[in-house]
Amino acid sequence: MNINEYQNYHETKAHTSAEFPYNTYLCSIPLDFPGVPPHWHDELELVVIKKGQGFVSVDFDKRLVHSGEIVMIRPGCLHAIEQDDTFKMEYENIIFKPDLLSSGANDLCMLQYIMPLLDGSLSVEYFLTPALESFEALSNCIRQIDLVCADQTPGWQLAVKSSLFNFFFLLISESQKKTVSTSSDSKSLEKMKTVLKYVENHYTEKLTIDDMAEL
């Protein structure tokens, strides 16, 4: 997977099958590409740092991440990945559609927990580090997912969904223990998304600051 495919996959590439909308990618910066510019998509994404360190930005919150840490990215969140100086970083992308966690229109778990988490009305930590009380348990969910995906024994999809539900249970439980401060300005985020989409559709034309201001 090259950087151009990665940049534009929301518009040009289906990441998952319709039957089981879940997939993973292993990436290395700068071996595979120098970085991932700001973008967003409709899928939920977990960035799991396997080796090294680098920068991950989520809704303009840029942080240095290290081996073992996890970044949770909601659908629609603007995010980017950058190299830290000369350091290398290997990471796993876990990408899946929210529908994977739904059991139907009247699913209480989806309505009461998952949807509020995904739309931002339920505040949770995005950057998951050893400072969190539940970090080891969260990391174990990822390890279990990796194991069953590697073996793919009959019923492995059930195990993936089970681990994802446990992951979000832990994440939501963690959020109840303390107040998560959020400084994102949703209005500016929507503006940024509009500008990025305009540039993508008109990149062959001469663009000015005035053009951007009128969007």
What residues fall within each predicted segment?
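Short, Lys/Arg-enriched, Trp-marked, Pro/Gly-tolerant hinge/linker segments that flank
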Residues: V124-F135, C149-L215
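Phosphate/oxyanion-binding loops and surfaces in catalytic or ligand/nucleic-acid-binding neighborhoods
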Residues: D99-S103, L117-S121, V148, L170, ...
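Short amphipathic alpha-helical/adjacent loop interface patches that line ligand
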Residues: P98, I142, L164
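Ligand-binding loop in jelly-roll beta-barrel domains
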Residues: G76-D99, N106-C109
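Generic protein-terminus/edge-of-domain signal
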Residues: M1-I70, C77, D85, M110-Q112, ...
